[in-house]
């Protein structure tokens, strides 16, 4: 499935760009650069398609955003959300690794993944539902495909928000492409990157590919020898990490398509997102069963 998706994405990307993408300066001049302002913008743009946290709590969600200490940059992810203690759900933390997260659209979509409507928003929303409507013991269970699939799913949506930001500012970041197409291409680039890492992960840990084969594949996609070795080392020591993101994302999209068919004219992104969030972290088999139990009428 991941291989089929990669071929389809690559074909679409080549058709849109003519094989010569003009994306080099995309991080120069994006209208938003302050992380707090970016989170505020994301919260405003998501209102139409995502249920409000205010529907569940009168408390204000706080988020402390700081850069990763320079001494830890080499050992940290590009950014990460720190799950709050169970008795301090409103006190949230996001850390940004400036050595591997560029300003501009990359920072914007990264904060969407980690913050709104990604990890922070999903964690707080699902936790509030769990505390009041289901069983709190569910918090002890971990479903990486759901959590990271949701975060990557919302990251992909944030490219549409970024296009809106650019259009409102009448900017294209120096690219010859209009804002909407530019952000579509950047999203597809991201898909290709994550999908490639998934395929290489399977090649290494399931099919037993040699290091030289993986390095050759990475270099064929334009990575330097040093970058390729770094990616290989990560895949070798952290098997199946990227699969949580991309396969989870594919499953989330498949679930949305099922909801569109089942709910027909009563489908909306708001309803679908509420369904996923209220179901809470789960495996996709049970999410599908739960979806089949919902009525076609507006819920």
Label every model-predicted segment.
Residues 1-299:
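N-terminal maturation segment of proteins
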């Amino acid at each position: 499935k991941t291989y089929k998706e990669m071929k389809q994405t690559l074909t679409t990307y080549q058709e849109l760009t003519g094989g010569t993408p003009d994306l080099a300066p995309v991080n120069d001049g994006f209208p938003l650069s302050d992380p707090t302002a970016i989170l505020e913008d994301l919260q405003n743009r998501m209102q139409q398609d995502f249920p409000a946290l205010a529907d569940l709590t009168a408390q204000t969600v706080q988020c402390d955003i700081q850069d990763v200490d320079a001494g830890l940059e080499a050992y940290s992810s590009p950014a990460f959300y720190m799950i709050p203690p169970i008795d301090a759900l409103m006190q949230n933390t996001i850390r940004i690794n400036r050595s591997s997260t560029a300003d501009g659209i990359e920072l914007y979509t990264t904060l969407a993944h980690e913050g709104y409507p990604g990890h922070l928003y999903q964690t707080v929303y699902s936790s509030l539902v769990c505390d009041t409507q289901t069983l709190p013991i569910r918090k002890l269970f971990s479903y990486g495909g759901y959590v990271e699939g949701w975060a990557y799913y919302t990251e992909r949506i944030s490219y549409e928000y970024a296009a809106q930001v650019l259009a409102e500012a009448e900017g294209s970041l120096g690219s010859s492409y209009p804002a909407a197409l530019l952000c579509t291409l950047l999203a597809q680039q991201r898909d290709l990157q994550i999908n490639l890492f998934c395929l290489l992960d399977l090649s290494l840990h399931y099919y037993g590919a040699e290091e030289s084969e993986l390095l050759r594949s990475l270099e064929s996609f334009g990575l330097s020898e040093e970058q390729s070795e770094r990616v290989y080392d990560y895949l070798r020591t952290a098997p199946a990490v990227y699969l949580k993101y991309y396969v989870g994302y594919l499953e989330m999209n498949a679930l949305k398509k099922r909801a569109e068919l089942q709910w027909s004219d009563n489908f909306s992104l708001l309803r679908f997102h509420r369904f996923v969030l209220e179901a809470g972290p789960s495996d996709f088999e049970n999410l599908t069963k739960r979806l089949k139990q919902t009525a076609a009428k507006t819920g």
